[in-house]
């Protein structure tokens, strides 16, 4: 928390010196934390108001509650505390006078102002330069920032004297001595001129002499320029300019001061005309010279290079029964003709004959990705008489499968009958260029080639729709850089990309280019910049941003360069918060929301400068072995995100490339980790400084297809980083039925809303609703109920009477399903926001109310939770919709319950659909036409490589450490989780002793903690579930408890009765035993077993960024990650049956459904039986039905196979067997030697051992 003691304020309200109780730019939440730490009645501070510019907020602590009073300036710059009607207003000239009066008792405040609370300052070294680690050792002189750049705002007045202090010394040393001469004139000759004017003089001789003296150097410079231009002019025209010649001849003649000034003005006028004339002369001369030459070629109008036909070698995946009929599995060649819109299936027969079938693009109905087998893909073809057929193919690799899917999507898009696209591809590049010009060839950056997750060679040349290039320490001029980018793209794609925006701040630049066909789809372009150096004004660090609308979808792009230095993590965090708050992008009507909530899709990238907290030799050893997992555990950015300090609920693709900084220039083989400085040797450990993160609205479509770095661009000590994204977009919807009439109006109706807000205040609140589908924002009435079980948190509730009915401007479901609602919870006393959130309308559409549940945040900090019940009523005649192109690819739901390689957990209810590695959970959707018939079925938790057709997601963090504890148990029941909405055990404020709960008794049953983490303090609140989670199995269930055992509420908070409108399976159906620990409330809780994952190299013990799910935080009692863990299971139990846990295996027709919009994961994994796949493929149903019989799913057989392989010491082959379809012991008995070889078993002894063991088990 940073607070400055500068002195903004109207009319010098703070006097000549800012007092200790004044905190500039301090947030409301941070102010309450400072007062809570003070802990004494009468503690107070003054901060800037968040709702009214130029106003202040007086915060007073009394009886452990914070009371806030607004201090408003009037038209005469007097200050007064806002009072109730009828109370006389007292006016003050300064804040000091105001505080002095209210420090006396009985002045109308809740208590007298007794104890001023000072801010916490981060100690800075005397020379506070960002180049502390040698990163910017010789930065070029920064150019002037453009007119669109903005700096941190300062108040209209300053406590310091006039503007002469910081600039005078520099000005005195200016080469022309202008400031010195001017200063001398004002001190001496000014008086003489004044006397002369009083005496009737009509001119100012001393001022004239002063100006002439100051401009003498300008005289000589103009003479030099004129002389050079005259020579250049003679190249194109033999005649000289007589005026120029005369002026040059007079340059050595003696002149008086007045004559000198007249001569200078004349020279400047001649120079202006001469510059214009010489251009015309040159143009005419060159036109005459080329009149006999052949005409210049016309600009190229070629379209993008055509995509050649691509072939993929695959094997047909068949059942065991079919395999016995046809013998060895069949091999196919799939040829994709994007330009022709055809897919050809070529099957090679044993007698060398070929059999092929051609499907046009409109006969390919759906692609179904297997979640469990990464290189398996189901393709649904349309046959005659409206029948379909599904074929499952096994590709050579998962990358080939993704390339095939991308080509088919491109083919569908190219031949679509839709006028506007449903999906576009976006390239994001970030590169710290090290103040060195780039090499001639940067194609590998443009085409995402290099290390990490890269595109397949068949798709690298496909041009993206939008290219965004962010650079730092870029010494190339803006125009030159833009031309370089456009030229590179032109050479690569044969397309003339259009520049949409270019924004610079010093040497930080962001450039956005789009395909020519999309130029008219771009609107509302906005640019901005923020300085984050010393006092947010000096230095060379900061951020630049660009935002625009692509049809109906808003995009934001932020390129930043944060403070360098291993030890400056807190400063980097503050840089991020400053950028988040001060960058002015997007819709101005959404100024109540920070930029993380203003855009459908926000991409944040750049040189974030977060480092690795590990010894340099250990880092180098891990890099040499290409073991990045231990390094990612000590990555500062990951650690800070897991503590909710920065990038709240942003996503980042899994990192599989080496650290991009700090390389020896000219090579990518050596890290230059030591730097000789005057103060000694400076160590710059290799780090992932250059990153790409993103945040999207819930229930939107976004997939990260690549994330890596180049390995052949070596001019800088940073490697360029790239990321490519598949992004769903919406069109500017035009209703075929026209604007909504009263008879067919759509309505957004709320039954209730309930929020938990992190505050020590007890004021009333109201909600504001914003959306592009509304004509204007709407407000609710103040809440009609509130309660508090904890001093630092307040639960507020609104019934339907207090909530408005919203009327969208259009009533069509196709329009409404793409809309979102932004909510901000504001206080009645100061009209300041206590938290904002976004809710997708798609899941709320229906004839019955649906539940929504999400987090509140403010100024980048998590400040609460909000849940409610609402419905979007759409007239029946406006229910028509169509399938989006990105919904054409789905996840095989039959396999969704199987384990994935690295599952992760989400933290909210409504999330963007993303196929990235880090977003965490899949949810199968039902068609919108079915929304009025039945609620959606929730899928089990997982981490798919690609999204389902409608998978709401929130921003999870990456699990990096398998939790330690007891071996995986089964079959023991645990108590159901309690409702955290009324459980004070969840509410812990950072640095403040818990005042309502007894201290936690020691728990001897806690899982052992690694030695490297013994210096950490246990947390007794829910942790944000960062570990791997075992997926539920039919008939088995899964644990509902969090990884940290001390997270369950005490037993005196029973769950409420089950609402009739929201019935679904409880989060824990068949809980499993685990180590018993006690939470703060004293309730016993059984921790879940460690999850299962594919074998990976063993990791040495060490501090883990995921330590929060182990129930630990860093030393120093840093509980910031649990400032708001208050409702990790916010509403799970409110809708859980009160009776005993039921069996996880239910007959299909009786499966219970959750309300749409509730999370599949809210701090812990939910367990549901894997839903049956719903397809129109009749011939496949009979084949798939046995898989769900007998109370087992595919994951169960896989687990048995895993145990069997471990028993015989051959677990290394598990992944190869699973990827080739041998995932169940029941079918392994039919495996052959050839099948084992294809699965990677080459050792004859191992093959014999496997076959013999299987034979004995028959």
Swiss-Prot record:
A motif (NPXY motif) lies at residues 983-986. The modification Phosphoserine is found at residues 132, 241, 352, 890, 1131, 1257. Activated upon translocation to the sites of synthesis of PtdIns(3,4,5)P3 in the membrane. Enzymatic activity is enhanced in the presence of phosphatidylserine. Changing residue 958 to A: Reduces PDGF-stimulated tyrosine phosphorylation and association with SHC1. Its EC number is 3.1.3.86. Residues 156-166, 938-950, 996-1007, 1048-1059, 1087-1104 have a biased composition (Pro residues). Residues 119-180, 897-1118 are annotated as: Disordered. Residues 145-155 have a biased composition (Polar residues). A motif (SH3-binding) lies at residues 944-949. The modification Phosphotyrosine is found at residues 886, 986, 1135, 1162. Residues 119-132, 951-965 have a biased composition (Basic and acidic residues). PROSITE patterns: SAM_DOMAIN, SH2. Tyrosine phosphorylated by the members of the SRC family after exposure to a diverse array of extracellular stimuli such as insulin, growth factors such as EGF or PDGF, chemokines, integrin ligands and hypertonic and oxidative stress. May be phosphorylated upon IgG receptor FCGR2B-binding. Phosphorylated at Tyr-986 following cell attachment and spreading. Phosphorylated at Tyr-1162 following EGF signaling pathway stimulation. Phosphorylated at Thr-958 in response to PDGF. It is a peripheral membrane protein. Widely expressed, most prominently in skeletal muscle, heart and brain. Present in platelets. Expressed in transformed myeloid cells and in primary macrophages, but not in peripheral blood monocytes. It comes from the Eukaryota. Interacts with tyrosine phosphorylated form of SHC1. Interacts with EGFR. Upon stimulation by the EGF signaling pathway, it forms a complex with SHC1 and EGFR. Interacts with cytoskeletal protein SORBS3/vinexin, promoting its localization to the periphery of cells. Forms a complex with filamin (FLNA or FLNB), actin, GPIb (GP1BA or GP1BB) that regulates cortical and submembraneous actin. Interacts with c-Met/MET, when c-Met/MET is phosphorylated on 'Tyr-1356'. Interacts with p130Cas/BCAR1. Interacts with CENTD3/ARAP3 via its SAM domain. Interacts with c-Cbl/CBL and CAP/SORBS1. It is linked to Genetic variations in INPPL1 may be a cause of susceptibility to metabolic syndrome. Metabolic syndrome is characterized by diabetes, insulin resistance, hypertension, and hypertriglyceridemia is absent. Its ability to confer resistance to dietary obesity suggests that it may serve as a possible therapeutic target in cases of type 2 diabetes and obesity. This is Phosphatidylinositol 3,4,5-trisphosphate 5-phosphatase 2. It comes from Homo sapiens.
